[in-house]
Amino acid sequence: MKKYKVFEMLKRSQNLKYRLAINSLIVGILVGLTIVAHRIIISKLSPIFLNIYKNGRHNFIIVPFIFLTLIALGYIVGKCLKKQPMISGSGIPQVEGILTRNLKMNWFSVLMYKFVGGLICLCAGLSVGREGPSVQMGACIGEGVSKNLKNLDNEEKYLITSGASAGLSAAFNAPLSGVMFALEEAHKNFSPLVLTSAMIASISADFVSKQFFGLIPSLDFRKVEPLPLKNYWTLIILGIIIGISGVIFNKGILKTQSLFKKSKLSIEIKCIIPFVITGVVALIYPILLGGGHDLIMALKEQNFTVTVLFTFIIAKFLFTFICFGSGVPGGIFFPLLVLGALVGNLIGLLFTTYFGIDNTYIINFIILAMAGHFASIVKAPITAIILISEMTGSLNHLLALGIVAIISHLTSDILKSSPIYESLLERILERYAIKDNLTEGKKLLLEIAVSMDSVMVGKCIKDIKWPKNCLVVSILRGDNELIPNGDTEIICGDYLTIMTDEEIYQELLDSI
């Protein structure tokens, strides 16, 4: 395997920012086109399935053929999953694993199988979202561009992050959310290089997406009046309940996944199960099919009773648990937002019934609950606030969104619920014993931002306990680049350029 010399890495790093800008633009355009194609095919095939299900509810003769078709599709997805296990689930944990250098994938194989497998699951109506697969496909394209351009490993990491950001941006028509997700959740690093590359890719992918789908936000709630300040006491209760709901979601996903893992059923049978359940749901509660975009819009237009909402919540929870727990390729972004919206609608209805809140503000509780649910489950409150603002096309709810997001986030912390994607990543690493497959001797050149609460702040380089084979090459302080020595003191806001071995990358991040 090729090993890059230190001199070559340092030489290439001089023009890294400009090279990344161009490469990220390429990645963003390619990701945008790929996700647009994915969305268009889904929009064409999904109505066909819905029409077939509708006919099945009125003509029981075709019901057996519906289930035979779903079983066949489940078998095909199972074969795809057996051929390429990395397409399992949303794909976001896999991307995070790649960014920590613990996980490897065949980018082209994952891209192809994820595209096909995700299409089948989404068109058939399984309770999964397209956003996670979009992130993974974007990351695959980022890695593919990097490998074809023969970039160094640290450059590849930036382009993978850019691709993931672009994938979310194109899926939701939410470019800022794509950038923030890359910074807050995927890369967990707010360095200028990550920000620049992710923003260029995200904006370019969003531009491509809007050429096909227009400027209308994903959830059109632009004419909703903000909740009056006198009613803000309700946000505390909403945040706590949504936080608890998020904990239930996390535990349910992990528990169901464990049950499927312990079963001795073949991968094909495991994938067939959620397809059969989908057939049952299609005949009884068709509104619960798919990720849930139509259900959220139905909450805006229709007045459901408490009993109906409670039934929807229980059914959607169980439906999502089974679909995602089975391992079929599909995300949890939209299902978790739908569940948040349902719980928010229920709470809003109770507030209007028993506490005199005007019923015109029920829609506010729906919007706020989606952000709170995301913050509680994913533990990315800033992304949650920006995402819901972009999806609804309104910035009028920022204060209320912030309150609900932080309260739900704290509630899940108190209940000791871990971020869902980190929990899923731990299981993936354990399953594949990734730590035994690391490449030795490969060098990485990293840029690390020094935060206010970092253990390095106020210390000299010589006083910090660095991992073995780790060298601080330079420090960017404002507009000045310093060549450090052992007596150089690190302050908040510094950006450290560190050279290290690939196998201790995660150890380095954990130690600082």
Language-model features: locations:
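Cytosolic Rossmann-like ligand/nucleotide-binding regulatory domains
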Residues: 451-508, 512
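Extended boundary segments
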Residues: 423-462
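Short, solvent-exposed coil/turn segments
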Residues: 95, 441-443, 483
